[in-house]
Amino acid sequence: MFAIITRNFPPELGGMQNLMEGLSNALLNHGPVKVFAENYDNAEEYDENSKLEIERISGFKLFRKYRKANRIKEFMEENEIRAAFFDHWKSIENIETSILKKTRSFCLIHSKEINHPLGTSLNKRVLKSLSKADHVIANSRFTKELALKLG
């Protein structure tokens, strides 16, 4: 089974939403896929028509990220996960390293989200979060070079 942990997923519109949906659907060719995503209007209708197993996390943003991390921890402890894919450093930030060591983990990065001056609290949070992933995947050569420059 594959786990997709994302803040961006249809029915919300956008490039990242399309990317994460495409990745999830492509992984279906290799085994079952469980998606943990934010809840949006019309999500129930989308989920019913999808071949993916989608679990929506809702609630106040401040609490939602911790509830989501706890739910992912519980799921990964109870299931054999071949690989976990995270759409953003914030999606992996609150996942315990001990849980991530049970599988292969991939985290996508985007230049806008990592472009924080060296040594700032945000830069340190990004680096700490990305260090948890086995593989960090840049969405462009520019992003890759920026990431190398920023730590």
Task: Give the location of each predicted region.
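Extreme N-terminal starter segment of soluble prokaryotic enzymes
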Residues: M1-A3
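N-terminal strand-loop element at the rim of the active site
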Residues: T6-L13, L19-R64, T143, L148
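A short, histidine- and acid-enriched strand-loop-helix "catalytic/donor-clamping" loop
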Residues: E12, F63, I92-E93, S105-T120, ...
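Short, well-structured alpha-helical segments in soluble
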Residues: N70-N79
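Structural alpha-helical scaffold elements that stabilize or flank donor/cofactor-binding regions
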Residues: E77, K128-S129
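Structural motif
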Residues: R82-A83, H135
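Short His-centered aromatic/hydrophobic patch
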Residues: F86-I92
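A short, active-site helix/loop in glycosyltransferases that binds the activated sugar's phosphate group
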Residues: A133-G151
